[in-house]
Amino acid sequence: MYAIVKAGGHQEKVEVGDTILVNRLDAKNGETVEFPVALVVDGEKVIIAAADLAKISVKAEVVNDDAKGPKIRIQKFKNKTGVARRKGHRQKLTQLKITAIA
C-alpha cells in the first residue's frame, strides 16, 4: 500500500516505514505530523475520490528537524568588466519517517 501526499509544497510517494525529506516544517523532533492525501493505491484498488480521500491521512514522525540539503553555488560573471559574484544556498529540510496510512 502506498500513497501520494502533499508535503512541504511538493507531492511525495510514501509507504509505511519510508523516510523522506521535505521543506522545513514547524515541528520538533519526535512530534507527529499529518498530511493530506492526493491518491492511495492498495494492491489493485486505487482511491482518488475526494470524499474517500478526506477520510484517509498519512501520519509521520519527525526524525530530524534540522536537516540541510546540498550546497548550491551560484556564479555570475560579466565579460570584460571585472564583475564577478559568487553566492551559495543550502535549503533547510525536515526528515520524516512515515508511521501510518489510515
From Swiss-Prot:
Picking any one GO molecular function of the record gives:
structural constituent of ribosome
Which terms under GO biological process does the entry name?
translation
- What Pfam families does the database record attribute to this sequence? Ribosomal_L21p
Query: What SUPFAM superfamilies does this protein map onto?
Result: L21p-like (SSF141091)
- Keywords, alphabetical: Ribonucleoprotein, Ribosomal protein, RNA-binding, rRNA-binding
A GO cellular-component term linked to this record? ribonucleoprotein complex
Which InterPro entries does its entry note?
Answer: bL21-like, bL21-like_sf, Ribosomal_bL21, Ribosomal_bL21_CS
Q: How does it assemble?
A: Part of the 50S ribosomal subunit. Contacts protein L20.
Task: State the family named in the UniProt similarity comment for this chain.
Answer: Belongs to the bacterial ribosomal protein bL21 family.
Functional description taken from the UniProt entry: This protein binds to 23S rRNA in the presence of protein L20.
Family matches, as PANTHER family: 50S RIBOSOMAL PROTEIN L21 (PTHR21349), LARGE RIBOSOMAL SUBUNIT PROTEIN BL21M (PTHR21349:SF0)
Q: What is this protein called?
A: Large ribosomal subunit protein bL21
Protein's organism: Bifidobacterium animalis subsp. lactis (strain AD011)
Output the lineage of the source organism: Bacteria, Bacillati, Actinomycetota, Actinomycetes, Bifidobacteriales
